[in-house]
Amino acid sequence: MAHYFVGDIQGCFAELQKLLAKVDFNPSRDELWAVGDLVARGPDSLATLRFFRSLGDSAKTVLGNHDLHLMALHGKLKRAKPSDNLTEILESPDISASIDWLRQQPLMRELPEHQLIMSHAGVPPQWSLEVLREEAALVSCALKQDDYLEALISQMYSDSAEQWDPSAIGIERLRYCINALTRMRYLYVDGRLDFDCKQPPENCTNPQLKPWFEFASPLRQSHTLVFGHWAALMGNVGDSKLKALDTGCCWGEHLTLWHLEKDQKITQKKLKKS
């Protein structure tokens, strides 16, 4: 059995299939773990989502910001932009089933036997494993409720929840968790989330900002952290226990697959349009 972890697919289904062929992926024996953002921007979000649904227990994904955005669009809480490239999936006959499937996916997953944690954007350095589990579970619980659109999705878009406050309750607590696990890149020196800078660290001009993974963290010491979201890193973080897998396929770069057992990365360049 092999565990394969794939970066942000974002509808780049053909590239995903090329990658899986390279490693002879077999869902009857292997598992495919995705760091989230299965959909948006790329040409084939519908096929990507249907493929993951078809894999059953052989597929493990976490929610990314674009997956949550799809829920908001389906619930008519936001207007789609042309760059979302989600018209086909929103008009598909199985869109409700796809949304229901996404609602069952968590914000973080663990592989305890390998001391590994996967989330879309990373893990706040202030959080212990226990806090991470608790906060992610609160969001998962809210997503599974009948009123998830009104109680959570309609209120999740806010930059106000930028600082971790263990005494926060209700939507503010859920917002911080969503912001941290699906949107985080840089933190201010006081631990606040920054939502603006997307550049790689060498190009960041604000001395008050540091990448989240450069802060001291108990989980950074004890676990391998697998994440995506930050395409500008191009997988370069300089730490063998950090696996940054978003390598910008939807922007014309490549899709990255990491074979856990071999600690090997396999890449597939963005395919040219035929």
Swiss-Prot record:
Pfam families the record matches: Metallophos
Top EC class for this record: hydrolase
GO CC terms, sorted: cytoplasm
Disulfide bonds: none
CDD domains: MPP_ApaH
Claim: tRNA processing is one of the keywords in the record: no
Example GO BP: RNA decapping
GO function terms (MF aspect): bis(5'-nucleosyl)-tetraphosphatase (symmetrical) activity; phosphatase activity
InterPro entries, A to Z: Ap4A_hydrolase, ApaH, Calcineurin-like_PHP_ApaH, Metallo-depent_PP-like
Database matches in SUPFAM superfamilies: Metallo-dependent phosphatases
Keyword DNA-binding applies: no
Catalytic activity line of the entry: P(1),P(4)-bis(5'-adenosyl) tetraphosphate + H2O = 2 ADP + 2 H(+)
Keywords: Hydrolase
Annotated EC: 3.6.1.41
Record-stated family: Belongs to the Ap4A hydrolase family.
Function (record text): Hydrolyzes diadenosine 5',5'''-P1,P4-tetraphosphate to yield ADP.
Name under which the protein is recorded: Bis(5'-nucleosyl)-tetraphosphatase, symmetrical
